């Protein structure tokens, strides 16, 4: 197991380089010039037609100096090489938007996004697995059909629409005020509050964003669990266990569920990047100061250093998620022995 984990960690290096290389060139090919945005803000927006020749020359000179300062006037492969060299020392440079160190901005916001994603993944599995077990043990009943219909409806609801409707109807819009419309803390939040009150306030703010980030995940995952269990329930060893007189509860929980979890562990690697992508929408709509909101603002500002830093963090988290899901397979199914050859 240890040797396999080491091999996978080493293979993550070329994978990471390939992912960041593609992301780097796609980002630079996107429309919009950060130098023009910078010059427009610094010179009063005088970048359009109808300004004086002197003003136009001042704008062009400012943009040329700014591009040279950040190396944007160099070939793309040279820019990527410089970026990769700085990445080794975690030197992501300064943000184009506010000249703040990119790494400090990420470190400040990373715990919020990790908390949201961790709670969302936990909620997805806590809801999806019991729903899948119930549907598989009650196939083709009205409750199974209702759960299937409910899951497909949830899976089809766009996250942007669901979050907007939640704010309008239950977050102090025109109807109810059950949850706060944004942020992580109340306006009267104080560090002098007792621990339980701080936890209660944060849970109140996190509940709705976590649920919204999770609903399509547990809707789809519950269907995977149902299909996997139905397949396992038809195996010969399940019939043998029943023939030995074992109760249905023991058969399901001891023999069926564990083998049914193998596909769900594999799917974990695909859920993680999807939830990270969903955090961009949720953090932006609910004004949560996480990496998703930072990424959205950086894209609008063409903040290349911040975008690439966030892209790198997301790539690393995704690769780690894939590795963890592979290692968990050996825990769920002891027959799997990674790195061994017969």
Role assignments for model-derived ranges:
Residues 2-3, 110-111, 115, 119-143, ...:
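Alpha-helical transmembrane segments of integral membrane proteins
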Residues 67-129:
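An internal, D/E-rich "acidic patch" concept
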Residues 21, 25, 29, 165, ...:
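Hydrophobic membrane-targeting alpha-helices
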Residues 6-12:
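N-terminal signal-anchor/signal peptide hydrophobic helix marking the start
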Residues 16-78, 170, 174-198:
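Hydrophobic alpha-helical transmembrane segments of membrane transport/permease proteins
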Residues 12, 20, 43-44, 125, ...:
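Residue-level recognition of pore/gate-forming positions within transmembrane alpha-helices
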Residues 12, 109, 113, 149-152, ...:
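Residue-level signal for discrete positions within transmembrane alpha-helices
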Residues 16-24, 152-171, 267-272:
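Hydrophobic alpha-helical membrane-insertion segments
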